[in-house]
């Protein structure tokens, strides 16, 4: 997910590019002082419209944070799967070909795909949110318009723009398989597939699982948290990306909230206030995994095509609930929050009760159950149970079984 840009998937965005939004309308998700960096730079170097003013500070911070990268921030897919429940740091998968991640269309697979291929698969007239990197605002373009822009030589582009919210799980002409570990750990899939008596055919699940991102050289996405503290998988088809990621320590989260609610947020470089940053550079073919709650900023040194998505996990329920609270404190509007989040948490409660009654052995921390009950007890949390008379009965049963 910041006043000027959209939220999620390692880079801020809205949930669905084809939501009904008036064409060419600029919009943000918090009301703040609007600052157009290109306008501020007008009259200076004409090239300034092609560089976000924070890039120099980003590069300095990136070099500093390289020293915090450790050997275990690169591991095989097999090792990652074995250690998944204990991993709380970002890392690269050293053998992405063994992950199960694959995207293909027109007899081409991930590394050979182009923006033209994506446009053909999704449709020329499909609308996408296009972010102006300087103003950090969005406009609605057709995919054909975007494709034409992307393919122009750099000197012919009028501004630096970014597409980071094209959800493609519905696209029939695009075979898109997530990493196997993501399919196994996705909490939405777990509860939708296993809670008894759910009408899953008439009850669509949240669509935040499969995205296509397209960034031109010098695109920049300012500091943000992915919505609801979701974890992220991020597969670079071609190009280059630079990330700086900071752990969700109490101090970092406090500074993030202060920055997010500042009237002049756009002019402040948050990296100067955060600690423990890790710098990661991604190249074509890399598969990157971001855990729950990491604050991060992204720079694009080369034109890039990325496939990735967000997912909730049972492992991170407590952290995810903390980030949901941060979203409330910083005034994130519903459009930029995880869809049906309360429904997912409610179904998680039912799933836990169901498993315990059936004698299924699960390692469940009391902290997780307490945090879940506390969140669900709130009168602001709306959920109608499927297998209980009401929410109160469900939570009492959950407490009796686990606490």
From Swiss-Prot:
Any single Gene Ontology cellular-component annotation: nucleus
Alphabetized PANTHER family for the sequence: PHD/F-BOX CONTAINING PROTEIN
Catalytic reactions of this protein: N(6),N(6)-dimethyl-L-lysyl(36)-[histone H3] + 2 2-oxoglutarate + 2 O2 = L-lysyl(36)-[histone H3] + 2 formaldehyde + 2 succinate + 2 CO2
EC code: 1.14.11.27
Protein name stated in the entry: JmjC domain-containing histone demethylation protein 1
Single GO biological process annotation from the record: positive regulation of transcription elongation by RNA polymerase II
Chief site of localization: nucleus
Residues involved in substrate binding: 221, 241
Function comment: Histone demethylase that specifically demethylates 'Lys-36' of histone H3, thereby playing a central role in histone code.
Binding site for Fe cation: 224, 226, 296
Localization terms from the record: Nucleus
Free-text comment about domains: The JmjC domain mediates the demethylation activity.
Superkingdom field: Eukaryota
Cofactor(s) listed: Fe(2+)
Organism the protein comes from: Candida glabrata (strain ATCC 2001 / BCRC 20586 / JCM 3761 / NBRC 0622 / NRRL Y-65 / CBS 138)
Annotated cofactor note: Binds 1 Fe(2+) ion per subunit.
GO terms for MF: histone H3K36me/H3K36me2 demethylase activity; metal ion binding; methylated histone binding
The family this protein is said to belong to: Belongs to the JHDM1 histone demethylase family.
JmjC domain span: 141-328
